[in-house]
Regions:
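Walker B catalytic acidic pair
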Residues: 231-232
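N-terminal basic, amphipathic alpha-helical segments
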Residues: 1-82, 260
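Conserved core of the PLP fold type I
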Residues: 81-224, 235-237, 242-256
């Protein structure tokens, strides 16, 4: 029984029954409805925000990608912010370069070498966050009335963006471990104008697309000249020896707009 994990030995106490939590099975691949009830979606999102404002503050909330303050080195972050402000040049109140600070863009470009991105600072544009980057990309890539393919379920902020830009959303069947079904994407290619994915550790499912799926999706979209906006915000939160590659690593035609922090 000890070998099977049912009991454990404790010094000077003997054997006790071991707690073995029940391992729940992973959810099945989602089967989203083909209907797009944007009004109902926006009302639901508004309700989520209201619950965040008036809800029990002692409850950890997983509806937004925001860690609790106790998990962050707040004092150290504040100290570094003060140090940075004190070392800013005299013209620090002026606008920076249009694409963003050159030193930051060089640092991001160097970061992409870890997955053979080989991007240069000229390829990088800094924004006020990934949501801002996705909004800019969508406004350039798609026009009012266009249809974008997304995972199901999808981060509700993406639904808000699509709604504000007058875009239609087509949800794809999504596996909680491997992400979207490439075959399902292939079937809807004639209906879509762009694709928006969180390829690594999707929010909210947590799925991570295998490299072969990423490569297949990128090649498929490139063949039909359909741009892919890739939100890679969570790519660095991994357990293992190496960071999972983004879809951008397999992009040979320049159809992937990659965003990260």
């Amino acid at each position: 029984m000890e070998k099977d994990g049912y009991i454990i030995s404790r010094p000077k106490s003997g054997y006790i029954v071991n707690y073995k939590p029940i391992r729940l099975s992973a959810p099945a691949t989602t089967q989203p409805s083909v209907k797009n009830e944007s009004k109902e979606v926006m009302e639901l999102i508004a309700e989520v925000y209201r619950s965040l404002e008036i809800g029990d503050k002692s409850i950890t909330r997983f509806s937004l990608g925001m860690p609790e303050d106790v998990l962050l080195p707040i004092a150290k972050l504040n100290k570094e912010l003060i140090r940075a402000i004190q070392t800013l040049p005299g013209n620090s109140t002026r606008y920076d370069e249009t694409q963003g600070n050159i030193h930051l863009r060089k640092a991001v470009a160097r970061f992409t070498y870890s997955w053979n991105g080989n991007l240069a600072e000229e390829d990088i544009v800094t924004t006020a966050g990934v949501t801002n980057a996705v909004a800019l990309a969508l406004s350039v890539i798609a026009k009012t009335g266009d249809t974008i393919a997304v995972e199901s379920p999808v981060y509700f902020g993406m639904l808000q963006l699509a709604n504000s830009l007058g875009l239609r959303v087509l949800e794809l069947p999504t596996n909680p471990e491997t992400g979207i079904d490439p075959d399902a994407l292939k079937r809807v290619l004639p209906q879509i104008n762009a694709c928006l994915l969180i390829s690594n550790f999707n929010n909210p499912l947590g799925s991570c697309m295998p490299d072969e799926h990423k490569k297949e999706v990128v090649n498929m979209l490139a063949e039909h000249n359909i741009p892919l906006i890739e939100d890679d915000l969570y790519g660095d939160i991994f357990f293992g020896n190496s960071r999972p590659k983004p879809c951008k690593a397999f992009d040979k035609e320049g159809i992937v707009v990659w965003g990260c922090i």
